[in-house]
Amino acid sequence: MKKSVTVGVSVVMLTTCLAAYAQPPHTHRLEATPATVVYGYYWPEAQPVLRIASGDIIDVDTLLTNTPEGLAKAGVPDDEIQPSLKAIVSEVTGERRGPGGHILTGPVYVEGVEPGDVLEVKILSIQPALDYGYNGCKGFLPENCEAGAPAKIIRLDRRHMTAEFAPGIVIPLRPFFGSMGVAPAPELGRLSSNPPGRHAGNLDNRELIAGSTLFIPVFARGALFEVGDGHMAQGDGEVDQTAIETSLRGRLQLTVRKDMKLTWPRAETPTDYISMATDPDLTAATRTAVQEMVDFLVSTRHLTRHQAYQLVSIAGNVAVTQLVDKPNVGVHVRLPRSIFVGR
């Protein structure tokens, strides 16, 4: 009889645990306000604005990288400039500003995440928050830019997800967050939001659209995830330093991955596996990104290094992610998921 009671209690406990495990993730709303953003940096000592459990979802607002004055100079009417942008630029000043130019929503502390883990960021959805974006002109070959010209305002057709650049030139829109990252290694201190790195950050990778998953190595407890720098369309290279920049709303799911160990961020999109790297030297960044893809194939597809390297040459696509986020340029390698059949 005692044995039956013990078994019964064990079954109840197991059922309770399974029921708890099966609970849907909690969804948190995170608006962009002076109290919920950082301005221009990633930092392991930053205070989190939200704490969530691993696997939870955040519905997050992000703001474009500009100022009310800059938008007004470019011709945006005052009633189309977001009040939240006005408040943040006005109130987040002095020591609260870092060396970079991005307004980033966060940091978000993910419970249970430790240095050495990987943060999985599932990009569930991305929507534009405005009917316009802008493009500046600096970057890689600034001699092509007209001196003193204001940013170009580009109206967005949110219904058809297109934008008319000029009469007869229509751009398809593929929104993504230019900056998604975690706190860097402690020895790097308060790191500018401008250059990307091992912590991800300002990757400006046009492939990270809705339906993609970004995997980021973690360097600080809780990860301290930040997101911003919304882009509606961008070419590889981002040669003039800007995309179609705008404010975005996103739904992201953040999960700790203790089963993964990464040196650099990686990603999976609906169509590709992606390795990536950054470095002040383009050749060095390319070398690392290619090697990262080789290592990925060796560990996940059980190929020899010889085979993996050959496969990258046959089926991989090496691209310059961006040339303008000084001091680092970015390179990524895409490998089609469709080549892996019958497994």
Regions found by a protein language model. Give the residues of each.
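Conserved mixed alpha/beta catalytic, RNA-binding, or beta-rich assembly cores of soluble enzyme
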Residues: 173-283
